[in-house]
A protein has these predicted regions:
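Conserved donor-binding/catalytic core segment of Leloir-type glycosyltransferases
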Residues: 1-16, 22-25, 42
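Short acidic alpha-helix that forms the nucleotide-activated donor recognition element
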Residues: 75-87, 108, 185
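C-terminal amphipathic helix plus adjacent low-complexity
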Residues: 156-271
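Nucleotide-activated donor-binding/catalytic signature segment of Leloir-type glycosyltransferases, i.e.
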Residues: 39, 44-48, 53-78, 82
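Short glycine/serine-rich donor-binding loops of glycosyltransferases
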Residues: 100-103, 121
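Short hydrophobic beta-strand element within catalytic cores of glycosyltransferases
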Residues: 112-115, 125, 132-138
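Aromatic "clamp/platform" in nucleotide-sugar-dependent glycosyltransferases that forms part
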Residues: 95
Length: 271
């Protein structure tokens, strides 16, 4: 019989740091007695083998001599809720993460979360400022764009935050920049152990506090509130939209196209 279940529900891709989750879980299990470790399970609802990630069963065979279970079936919403509720705690330590849907899902199901303090995952951590109010998107600027530096450490009881040990910026054409923040797997193991130590009624109470937080319409995590805000912003955009004036061409001069003259083997040209 298991008395501590850790749950992961996301893709097996590199930026999700799935291998680090397994290695952190192994490090945690190494730090407790064998008897206690045998009562722990890591459930991973993901594709065990993915070209965008790695071969997780092979990784477990070689690096994690503890109980790891893979869930590969596709479930409807109600069944996913049951799956979340088999867990005592969830874990999400992604890098390059815009939001991290799994984090909100776990909290809505009343399951506390071990989370990397980066990107949008910070939004559901419930960080508080000096005056006791919650940190919001309005507090972020181009000069200070993330709490990954630990400026505010007072957080909601429903999360076990892991502060990134490596902070950098990545990007692409559609996403010019995003935080590539990665935690040390040993720091993750420490937070797993803290959650394990709280297992039972204390951990359940933390999860229920998180559920209460994300269901509060003021913070905008539930779908109905997201839709309401989206509709409001679109209406506001349309109301304030001012089309550009038409450009009239009158007696435009004729443009003569000329072939470029290439300058030898250089990459410059003259027109």
């Amino acid at each position: 019989e298991k008395d501590f279940v850790l749950f992961y529900n996301a893709r097996n891709i590199r930026r999700k740091l799935v291998s680090d989750i397994i290695y952190a879980y192994r490090t945690f299990c190494d730090s407790i007695s064998k008897e206690d470790a045998n009562k722990c399970t890591l459930i991973m609802h993901t594709t065990p083998r993915d070209d965008n990630g790695t071969n997780l069963p092979e990784l477990v065979t070689n690096l994690c001599p503890y109980d790891v279970v893979f869930s590969t079936s596709r479930f409807e919403r109600d069944a996913m809720n049951y799956l979340y509720n088999t867990a005592d705690c969830a874990i999400l330590i992604s890098s390059n993460e815009g939001f991290g849907l799994m984090g909100t899902e776990s909290l809505i199901c009343g399951v506390p979360l071990i989370v990397n303090v980066s990107g949008g995952m910070q939004d559901y951590c419930g960080f508080k400022k000096e005056d006791g109010s919650y940190l919001t998107h309005e507090d972020y600027t181009t000069r200070w764009g993330s709490n990954h530096d630990g400026r505010y450490k007072d957080h909601g009881e429903w999360v076990y935050p892991v502060w990134p040990s490596s902070r950098s910026i990545q990007g692409s054409i559609p996403t010019p920049y995003i935080s590539d923040d990665r935690p040390d797997f040993q720091d993750v193991a420490i937070q797993i152990k803290k959650a394990w130590a709280d297992r039972g009624e204390k951990l359940k109470a933390r999860g229920l506090a998180g559920r209460k937080y994300v269901l509060n319409p003021e913070y905008g995590f539930v779908a109905s509130e997201m839709c309401k805000r989206f509709t409001h912003d679109i209406d506001q955009t349309l109301d304030k939209f001012k089309p550009r004036p038409r450009i009239m061409l009158d007696e435009a001069s004729c443009w003569e196209h000329s072939q470029p003259e290439w300058n030898g083997l250089t990459l410059t040209k003259e027109i």
